[in-house]
Every structure is written in structure tokens, then in C-alpha cells.
Swiss-Prot record:
InterPro entries attached to this UniProt entry: ARFGAP/RecO, DNA_rep/recomb_RecO_N, NA-bd_OB-fold, RecO, RecO_C
Name by which UniProt lists this protein: DNA repair protein RecO
Pfam families per record: RecO_C, RecO_N
Gene3D superfamilies assigned: Nucleic acid-binding proteins, Recombination protein O, C-terminal domain
Gene Ontology cellular-component terms listed: bacterial nucleoid
Keywords: DNA damage, DNA recombination, DNA repair
Its job: Involved in DNA repair and RecF pathway recombination.
A single GO BP: double-strand break repair
Segments crossing the lipid bilayer: none
Family, as annotated: Belongs to the RecO family.
Matching NCBIfam families: reco
Source organism (scientific name): Bacillus cytotoxicus (strain DSM 22905 / CIP 110041 / 391-98 / NVH 391-98)
Gene for this chain: recO
Upper classification of the organism: Bacteria, Bacillati, Bacillota, Bacilli, Bacillales
Length: 248
């Protein structure tokens, strides 16, 4: 049976001398993996459509196991991302997180739209670090994680947040911050932005400007929380940390 799907390539794996296994996150079926025969050959009609982060329409011969990619029609090559090492690093983080967080053939149109919007915002020049933080925040419920971003994790009051507690699973107000000796001190902007990132419609994203220190604190909160409750290892995250460390 042949199926035409709209999707974004989120992973490629070389298979033999000339073939690739291409993982596509599709609007219709969620994550699907297909064999792209001959895609490693420079003159192959599948060479360009099977590149990482390519957005396109794919004609797939579906089966009980691995499908076969027959042909594709490119919508966007994400050229702006490919030509910039920073954009490539952040986009790689986003697609790898999507891959690791999802199961095969689980339809999720909301997640497809979020992935599509994030990558296209990146191509349009929106701060890639902020976009990656938004995406990482919005992936929390997809992974079954629901931290307290709206109220204190202990007293459940909406007031004066001064720290984030991984142990308690959310923000702490000034009255209860001392209860966790391993709390992460945060500024007021961190709470406001994380709550915003968690709830707002990504399609309504306008001009965004976040201070470097605020981004650093948000990244610390999210990474620490993911490490404790998620257990997903991302190679792309390590590369981002190296970029930041060496300020390439």
C-alpha cells in the first residue's frame, strides 16, 4: 500500500554502501522509518529529500515493518539552518529530542505543527536558543512530565518565586525555598518565561528578546529536570554545551 505523507526528516542512518534508513516525523502518522534505497548516491532522486531536517511530501510503500521511500517532493530544505553551525546545533537538538520522545506510528498533529513552526521560525531569524528552550518546555507533557510552573510546588500559592526544586517538581516561593538545600536560585523572569513557554500558542510568537543570564538559568532548570525525570540522553545537547563552553 502506498501512502503520501507530509513530514520532516528527524534522523538518517547509513545502511550499506548506498542506502539510508530515514526517520520522518509526519503529520499523518507521527514517526515512521523508511528505507531510502540508493539515497547515498549523489545523483539519486532521493539524495536531497532524505537530508536531515528536510520538510517535504513523501511517497512511501508501507508495510508491517520498515517501509520503502519511493519518491519525495521538497517543500523546504531548511537552507538557512544548514548553512549556520549554531542553527544546525539547535535544530539538531530539537529533532533529536522529538525522535527520542516519541514512539513509532503514534499520530500527533500538534507535535508535528510545533516541530514545523520551530524550525521555520529558526530559518526566519528568531533566536535559536530561545526556540530550543520553548520546545524543550513544551515537550515536557509529551513525555508525561508536569512540573509546577504556575504555583509553589509545596504550598500551591502563586506568589514570590525565588527558586526551582527538582525534588519537589517545580518552583518554590520565598517561604518554602529553604526546604530544599539543592534548589536552583532563579530570577523573576525565569518563572514568568517558563510559565509562558509552557502555556502559550507557539503560532503567536512575536519578537522575542531574552537576556543571556535568564536563558542560562532556564536551561539549567530544564536540563536538571530532564536529567532527573526523563532519562533521555541527547548527543546534540552535549554539542550545544561544548559550543557554549568554547564560545565558538
Amino acid at each position: 500500500m502506498f501512502q503520501k505523507v507530509e513530514g520532516i526528516v528527524i534522523r538518517t542512518t547509513d545502511y550499506g554502501e548506498t542506502n539510508k534508513i530515514v526517520t520522518i516525523f509526519s503529520r499523518e502518522f507521527g514517526k515512521i522509518s523508511v528505507m531510502a534505497r540508493g539515497a547515498k548516491k549523489p545523483k539519486s532522486r532521493l539524495a536531497s529529500i532524505s537530508q536531515l531536517m528536510t520538510h517535504g511530501h513523501f511517497l512511501i510503500q508501507m508495510g508491517s515493518g520498515l517501509g520503502t521511500l519511493q519518491q519525495g517532493e521538497m517543500i523546504s530544505s531548511m537552507k538557512e539552518i544548514r548553512e549556520d553551525i549554531f542553527l544546525t546545533a539547535y535544530a539538531s537538538f530539537i529533532v533529536e529530542l522529538t525522535d527520542k520522545a516519541t514512539e513509532d506510528k503514534k499520530n500527533n498533529p500538534y507535535l508535528f505543527e510545533m516541530l514545523y513552526q520551530t524550525l521555520h521560525y529558526m530559518c526566519d531569524g528568531v533566536d535559536p536558543e530561545v526556540l530550543s528552550l520553548i520546545y524543550q518546555t513544551k515537550m515536557l507533557p509529551v513525555l508525561g512530565m508536569h512540573p509546577y510552573f504556575d504555583t509553589c510546588a509545596i504550598c500551591h500559592q502563586e506568589t514570590d518565586f525565588v527558586a526551582f526544586s527538582v525534588r519537589e517538581g517545580g518552583f518554590l516561593c520565598f517561604r518554602h525555598a529553604e526546604q530544599d538545600p539543592y534548589r536552583i536560585p532563579v530570577g523573576e523572569a525565569v518563572h514568568k518565561l517558563l510559565r509562558l513557554f509552557y502555556h502559550f500558542d507557539l503560532g503567536r510568537l512575536g519578537n522575542v528578546s531574552v537576556k543571556d543570564e535568564t536563558k542560562r538559568q532556564i536551561r539549567t532548570v530544564l536540563n536538571t529536570y530532564y536529567d532527573e525525570y526523563c532519562g533521555i540522553y541527547l548527543k546534540s545537547r552535549r554539542f550545544l554545551e561544548q559550543l557554549d563552553k568554547f564560545q565558538i
